[in-house]
Amino acid sequence: MSDIISIKDIDLAKKKIFIRCDFNVPQDDFLNITDDRRIRSAIPTIRYCLDNGCSVILASHLGRPKEISSKYSLEPVSKRLARLLDKEIIMAKDIIGEDAKTKAMNLKAGEILLLENLRFEKGETKNDENLAKELASMVQVYINDAFGVCHRAHSSVEAITKFFDEKHKGAGFLLQKEIDFASNLIKHPARPFVAVVGGSKVSGKLQALTNLLPKVDKLIIGGGMAFTFLKALGYDIGNSLLEEELLEEANKILTKGKNLGVKIYLPVDVVAAPACSQDAPMKFVPVQEIPNGWMGLDIGPASVRLFKEVISDAQTIWWNGPMGVFEIDKFSKGSIKMSHYISEGHATSVVGGGDTADVVARAGDADEMTFISTGGGASLELIEGKELPGVKALRSKENE
């Protein structure tokens, strides 16, 4: 993937730099940041620019605001970043308004300006070129370090790159690391290569499953999506999550796996309950015996032992999607145990963003994993073999 223009290929000295970051961090009801991994991941690129005598303008989105509201302000991000960098962060009140433009114009070498939430501008998600042009006009160099949004053709990710030539745009360190990791994983995995796929829906992972099959040695399917596969095999799954319209696709994946010699593992028992709540009664049952009206909400202890055995000889593990409804304590055990087993082994372990990263953080295993992707959707699309708009825009034309 070395045909992507890197920040290291660009002469940054004393220039004004725009860095598109991904500061889309989780917050509690009081807007306190509960996990600042994404902010910390951006620091190497920011420091590199400062070390080159640059002035730096940072931009990100946060959540999906319908209108401008303090709930989605990047103010808490600027405070956390200031603490992590031990440096003042100048906060703009807007994005391309008078406040941002004046502060951008007066920005001196070594100073950092953070623009307000990009999605307060309606044009951002529409890939609006006028917004992109306004943003581009503030700086001399554009750096994308926001892997988590590279699968979206948005104004600050794709349209903006049209206003910079190859000597003035490139990928930051985090973005490069993410892309290199994903492409090596797909092209040269150490074997046995095991994919552990979970989460609630088959529909979201269908393309990734299809693309992974020819590349993996074993495939573990857990989480809510496992029930569509179990149903396809003729099991009675009670009230468990089912995507009826995908039964045929599930069957195709199982057949394709068989033909390719891939060993596919599904849960053999589940934690069943009549309702998805902390107070509901629960019991462990084999998948053949899910009671009528009950639903499977986590993998059971026998499945945990089986999956542990399956990954015991793995050299590479790619994990995307929890094994159950991990947000509810009593249905989180399967996911937490999987996290422990994956992190304890000697395999190269790659965790695909989003919910899975939250599970790993909750299990206290983050430091033991080889690599935790900062982008759920983007990491899935790379595994699906798709070209991400934000990455394509940074390719060197000579190599096309």
UniProtKB/Swiss-Prot annotation:
Q: Name one Pfam family in it.
A: PGK
Q: What is its EC number?
A: 2.7.2.3
Q: In which pathway does it act?
A: Carbohydrate degradation; glycolysis; pyruvate from D-glyceraldehyde 3-phosphate: step 2/5
Q: Which residues bind substrate?
A: D22, F23, N24, R38, H61, L62, G63, R64, R119, R152
What is catalyzed by this enzyme? (2R)-3-phosphoglycerate + ATP = (2R)-3-phospho-glyceroyl phosphate + ADP
Single Gene Ontology BP term?
glycolytic process
An annotated GO cellular component of this protein is: cytosol
Query: Per its UniProt entry, which superkingdom is the organism in?
Result: Bacteria
Q: Where in the cell is it found?
A: Cytoplasm
A Gene Ontology molecular-function term?
ADP binding
InterPro entries reported for this sequence: Phosphoglycerate_kinase (IPR001576), Phosphoglycerate_kinase_N (IPR015824), Phosphoglycerate_kinase_sf (IPR036043)
Q: What is its main location?
A: cytoplasm
Which keywords, in A-to-Z order, does the entry hold? ATP-binding, Cytoplasm, Glycolysis, Kinase, Nucleotide-binding, Transferase
Indicate which residues the UniProt annotation says bind ATP: K205, G296, E327, G353, G354, D355, T356
Q: Which family does it belong to?
A: Belongs to the phosphoglycerate kinase family.
Q: How does it assemble?
A: Monomer.
PANTHER family for this protein: PHOSPHOGLYCERATE KINASE, PHOSPHOGLYCERATE KINASE 1, CHLOROPLASTIC-RELATED
Q: What is this protein called?
A: Phosphoglycerate kinase
* Organism from which the protein derives: Campylobacter jejuni subsp. doylei (strain ATCC BAA-1458 / RM4099 / 269.97)
